[in-house]
Amino acid sequence: MTTMSAPRIAGVATAGYGLAVALRPGVLLGPCGWSDDNTAGRAVARMAGMRDLASGLAMAVAARPNTMRLAIAIRVGSDLSDAVVLGRALRGRPQRAKAIAATVGWGLLCAATIAATRTG
């Protein structure tokens, strides 16, 4: 694996998921137990999908280690904010633990790839 391969792979995966959510909001809404019949819910899911697409692409194409670290930090911050927002929105619902685990887990996975950006 070449330098920065791990964050690039994580970036491509993130971008792919983001595109899937942007095109089909139910990919995000369904596991949360929300219907995708709601126009506002679909719009919010699409916004999150587009954000994930953009941040994933930033990780996939970052040319320098500092740029990659910034892209990773943005991705991790997005995942952690998703954990907070979904945790609050799903309070008292069975989907809450899974949503928090998925968002925090993905954030930690992306954070772990930062080691690949270290030189020397």
Residue positions per predicted region:
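Short amphipathic, positively biased membrane-proximal segments
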Residues: 1-120
